[in-house]
Swiss-Prot record:
Comment, domains: The 329-DSEL-332 motif is involved in the recycling of PTGDR2 to the cell surface after agonist-induced internalization. This motif seems to be required for GRK2 and GPRK5/GRK5 to promote agonist-induced internalization. Thr-351 is a major site for PKC-induced internalization of the receptor.
Region span, Disordered: 332-353, 384-403
Alphabetical list of PANTHER family matching this protein: CHEMOTACTIC RECEPTOR (PTHR24225), G-PROTEIN COUPLED RECEPTORS FAMILY 1 PROFILE DOMAIN-CONTAINING PROTEIN-RELATED (PTHR24225:SF72)
Protein name (record): Prostaglandin D2 receptor 2
Residues with PTM Phosphoserine: S330, S349
The record's account of how the chain is modified after translation: Phosphorylated.
Cell compartment(s), UniProt: Cell membrane
Extracellular side: 1-34, 93-104, 169-209, 267-284
Organism this protein belongs to: Rattus norvegicus
Major localisation: membrane
Taxonomic path: Eukaryota, Metazoa, Chordata, Craniata, Vertebrata
Gene Ontology molecular function terms on file: G protein-coupled receptor activity; neuropeptide binding; prostaglandin D receptor activity; prostaglandin F receptor activity; prostaglandin J receptor activity
Length: 403
C-alpha cells in the first residue's frame, strides 16, 4: 500500500490503480478462455514464423522480395516470442510478476514490431512502385544487398521510435495487490503541473505512433498502389501478380489488427481531459492490444496461402528434417558396413534408373523396355506433360511471388 503513494501518477493511472479485481464468474470464464487463446496463439506464432524464417532464409533463392519477407517474419517472430509472457500475465490474474526491467523490454518489443511492420510495408510498396514506374533505375540499383541496407535503416528508425515507450514504461502496484505494467508519464521530469504534463506526453505518444506507424505507411502504400495501377493501365497490363496479392493481404491484416489499437490509444490520450472516456479506454485497450499481437500469427498464414511455392518448400523442408531424424535413429542399430552398403545401393539405384524413366514407366506400363526406349528417342516434344512440368519447376525461380 505504501508503494502506491510513493510515485506520482497521472489521473487516469490513479483511477486504474484503484480498480478492484473482478469476482464475477462469467468474467473469470472469459479470462480462462483468453489465456487459452493467447497460449495457442503464442505457440502457433513461434512455430509459424520460425518455419518461415527457415524456408525463406535457407531454402529459397535470395532475392529482394525474399529479403522483405525475411525481415517481416523476423519482426513477427519477435512479437510472437513476447506473447507467452503476456499470456503468463493474464494467467496470474492480470498482474505483472516479472519485474520492471522485463516490463520495459516486453513492451518495447511490442512497439518495435508495430513500427517495423509499418516501415517494412512502406518499403515493399515503394519497391514495387519503382519496379513499374522506373524499371531501368530499379534494374541497376535494386539488389539484395541494397534491400538489406534499407531494412537495417528501417530497423534503426523503429528502435529510435521505441525509446520513449521504454523510458516511460513502469510497474505500478494496484490497490488489490496486483502489479500493472503500464505507462507512467511522470516517471521522468514530471514538472510542476501534473495534469498538463500527463496530457501533453500521452497525446504526443499516441499521435506520433498513429502517424508514423499507421497513417504514413498507409499513405505511402496507397499512393504507390495508385502509381502502379496508372502505369500498368497506360501499358495495357491489368494482370495482378502473386506478390501484389500477398502485399494486399498483409496490408489488410495490418489495418484490421492495428487500426483498433491506434483508435483506442487516441481515446486513451483524450481520456486525460474527458473523464467519460476513461472507462471505455481502460476496458477496450486490453482487447485491441491482443488483436494487435495476433497480427504476427496471421502474416505467416498469408505467406503460405498466397504463394504455393512457399507451401511446397515448407513441406519438402519438413520432410527432409523428418527423414534425417528417422535415418539417424535407424542407423544407431546398424553397423558401419550395412550403412555403407545401403548408401551404395541408393547411389546405384539413383544412377541406373532416371526419374523420367520411372515416370514414363508409371504412366505407360503397357510399353515394353525396347518400345519404351524407341519411344523416348522420338524427341522431348512427346514427353508427358508431367515430366516437363517437373523440369520447369526445378529450373524456375523459387521466388514465385514476383509474377
Amino acid at each position: 500500500m505504501a508503494n502506491i503513494t510513493l510515485k506520482p501518477l497521472c489521473p487516469l493511472l490513479e483511477e486504474m490503480v484503484q480498480l478492484p479485481n473482478h469476482s464475477n464468474s462469467s468474467l473469470r470464464y472469459i479470462d480462462h478462455v483468453s489465456v487459452l487463446l493467447h497460449g495457442l496463439a503464442s505457440l502457433l506464432g513461434l512455430v509459424e514464423n520460425g518455419l518461415i524464417l527457415f524456408v525463406v532464409g535457407c531454402r529459397m533463392r535470395q532475392t529482394v522480395v525474399t529479403t522483405w519477407v525475411l525481415h517481416l517474419a523476423l519482426s513477427d517472430l519477435l512479437a510472437a516470442a513476447s506473447l507467452p509472457f503476456f499470456t503468463y500475465f493474464l494467467a496470474v490474474g492480470h498482474s505483472w510478476e516479472l519485474g520492471t526491467t522485463f516490463c520495459k523490454l516486453h513492451s518495447s518489443v511490442f512497439f518495435l514490431n508495430m513500427f517495423a511492420s509499418g516501415f517494412l510495408l512502406s518499403a515493399i510498396s515503394l519497391d514495387r512502385c519503382l519496379q513499374v514506374v522506373r524499371p531501368v533505375w530499379a534494374q541497376n540499383h535494386r539488389t539484395v544487398a541494397a534491400a538489406h541496407r534499407v531494412c537495417l535503416m528501417l530497423w534503426a528508425l523503429a528502435v529510435l521510435n521505441t525509446v520513449p515507450y521504454f523510458v516511460f514504461r513502469d510497474t505500478i502496484p494496484r490497490r488489490d495487490g496486483r502489479i500493472m505494467c503500464y505507462y507512467n508519464m511522470l516517471l521522468l521530469n514530471p514538472g510542476s503541473d501534473r495534469d498538463t504534463t500527463c496530457d501533453y506526453r500521452q497525446k504526443a505518444l499516441a499521435v506520433s505512433k498513429f502517424l508514423l506507424a499507421f497513417m504514413v505507411p498507409l499513405a505511402i502504400i496507397a499512393s504507390s498502389h495508385v502509381a502502379v495501377s496508372l502505369q500498368l493501365h497506360h501499358r495495357g497490363r491489368q494482370r495482378t501478380g502473386r506478390f501484389v496479392r500477398l502485399v494486399a493481404a498483409i496490408v489488410v491484416a495490418f489495418i484490421l489488427c492495428w487500426g483498433p489499437y491506434h483508435i483506442f490509444s487516441l481515446l486513451e490520450a483524450r481520456a486525460h481531459s474527458v473523464t467519460t472516456l476513461r472507462q471505455l479506454a481502460s476496458r477496450g485497450l486490453p482487447f485491441v492490444t491482443s488483436l494487435a499481437f495476433f497480427n504476427s500469427v496471421v502474416n505467416p498464414l498469408l505467406y503460405v496461402l498466397t504463394c504455393p511455392d512457399m507451401l511446397h518448400k515448407l513441406r519438402r523442408s519438413l520432410l527432409t528434417v523428418l527423414e534425417s531424424v528417422l535415418v539417424e535413429d535407424s542407423d544407431l542399430s546398424t553397423g558401419p558396413g550395412k550403412r555403407c552398403r545401403r548408401r551404395h545401393r541408393r547411389r546405384a539405384s539413383s544412377t541406373t534408373t532416371p526419374a523420367s524413366t520411372l515416370l514414363l514407366a508409371d504412366r505407360f506400363p503397357q510399353l515394353r523396355p525396347a518400345r519404351l526406349i524407341g519411344w523416348m528417342r522420338r524427341g522431348s516434344a512427346e514427353l508427358p506433360r508431367r515430366v516437363r512440368e517437373q523440369s520447369q519447376e526445378k529450373q524456375g525461380s523459387l521466388s514465385c511471388t514476383l509474377d
